[in-house]
Design a protein with these regions (language model features):
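Short, contiguous pre-domain boundary segments
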Residues: 1-16, 34-35
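Acidic, low-complexity intrinsically disordered tails
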Residues: 5-8, 378-383
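Catalytic cores of DNA base-excision repair glycosylases
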Residues: 25, 29-215, 221-229, 307
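Active-site segment of metal-dependent pyrophosphate-handling enzymes
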Residues: 146, 249-251, 301-339
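Conserved hydrophobic/aromatic beta-strand scaffold that supports enzyme active sites
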Residues: 218, 252, 266, 328-332, ...
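N-terminal strand-loop-strand
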Residues: 229-280, 309
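The catalytic Nudix box helix
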Residues: 281-315, 352
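NUDIX/MutT-family hydrolases
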Residues: 332-375
């Protein structure tokens, strides 16, 4: 296997003939191979915007159902803007990266207040909305407003890095500076052709020029692709090496109000931060040399100001976030004394298991709820 040469800072310009050939072959390939997806059937800016946000961190197969349900629940930008944030997060529940939902909601409110509820048509106004970067704005402009704009999401960066054998880390801003002009150079001027080209470029990255095992045998760009010519598909794109991901043990309380085990205490996470605006079972990080039951009791005293009895361990749940991993150690707990105060959360609520379905929880917490629901007669002996 050949290794990449030192990072190239500039690219050899593509001739008009090569550009034309790349456009034509990619669009023809897309017409024959592009998947039929609901957001490709519409030019509605709101629907296109929603799909682009949902697709930022999530696979197409997962997005389709969420996309339909979200549009059914919030059929217009104004209906989204007017909804409480809790309802928006509930619709987003399970899709992850919840800042996307919070930003979508904030942006809808800005559109309602500044643009009379109509999605803006000026590129500068689009890119000024929360949660919309240059590439997402480019996609919305191209797909909904028929304004050809280049795109540069993760899939597109990978395809372009291979096409031109760009051997600089694709996460770096300096690499994007090389790639933006390339994406723009390849884009046709005609709005309809630009729609097809950008859709095709995304499709190529998602289904053919994949991160692992790209299927070069059916790629329309094989003849021009420098990575293919030099057998560098496995080396490109170059990524910045990630630091080892830290792991935290988290003590979590399923905290019952009394021995009838009807109501449980849940906490609303702070707005700004990981999983902001979602509800959770309270708890926190274990300190060095601390037992897990002691961690749960301490966290509840520090964050809620009440004394509890910590009982048996119910379950252990492992979960990975982008920058760290956690193991949730979940304990059956009973309220003892004190007045619950939301010292580290926005709000606290005693709820029954049935009532929990009205609140949005992170995925790992939903697994705790599933466990509790599947064991309705769970009667554990408190220590
Ligand atoms: S030939 Fe292979 S590596 Fe090159 S763009 Fe096509 S799928 Fe990607």
């Amino acid at each position: 296997m050949k290794s990449p040469s030192p990072p190239n800072k500039t690219l050899t310009p593509l001739s008009a003939k090569v550009v034309q050939s790349l456009r034509q072959s990619l669009i023809a390939w897309f017409k024959a191979n592009g998947r039929s997806l609901p957001w490709r059937e519409t030019r509605q800016p709101y629907a296109v915007w929603l799909s682009e946000i949902m697709l930022q961190q999530t696979q197409v197969n997962t997005v389709v159902d969420y996309y339909h349900r979200f549009l059914a629940r919030f059929p217009s930008i104004v209906s989204l803007a007017d909804a409480p944030q809790a309802d928006v997060l509930k619709q987003w529940e399970g899709l992850g990266y919840y800042s996307r939902a919070r930003n979508l909601h904030k942006a809808a409110q800005l559109i309602r207040d500044r643009h009379h509820g109509v999605f803006p048509t000026q590129f500068d106004d689009i890119v000024a909305l929360p949660g919309i970067g240059q590439s997402t704005a480019g996609a919305i402009a191209t797909f909904a407003l028929m304004q050809p704009r280049p795109i540069l999401d993760g899939n597109v960066k990978r395809v372009l890095a291979r096409l031109m054998a760009i051997d600089a880390p694709i996460q770096e801003a300096t690499t994007a500076k090389i790639m933006w002009p390339l994406s723009a150079r390849l884009l046709p001027d005609d709005p309809e052709a630009a729609w097809q080209f950008n859709q095709a470029l995304m499709e190529l990255g998602a289904t053919c020029c994949t991160l692992k095992n790209p299927d070069c045998s059916r790629c329309p760009w094989q003849k021009t692709c420098q990575a293919y010519a030099r057998n560098l598909q496995g080396e490109l794109p170059v990524s910045v090496k990630r630091k080892p991901v830290p792991h935290h043990d988290i003590g979590v309380a399923v905290l019952w109000k009394d021995e009838t085990r009807q109501q449980c205490l849940i906490a609303l996470r702070p707005q700004d931060g990981l999983l902001g605006g979602l509800w959770e079972f309270p708890g926190g990080k274990r300190e060095a040399d601390e037992t897990l039951p002691a961690c749960v009791a301490r966290e509840i005293m520090e964050e809620i100001g009440i004394e509890i009895a910590v009982g048996a361990k119910l379950t252990e749940i492992k979960h990975a976030y982008t920058h760290f991993k956690v193991t949730l150690h979940v304990y059956d707990c009973l309220y003892v004394s004190g007045i619950p105060q939301p010292k580290a959360s926005q709000a606290l609520q005693w709820v029954t298991l049935d009532e929990m379905s009205a609140y949005a929880f992170p995925k790992a917490n939903n697994r705790i709820i599933d466990l509790l629901k599947s064991n309705p007669a769970m009667q554990l002996t408190l220590c």
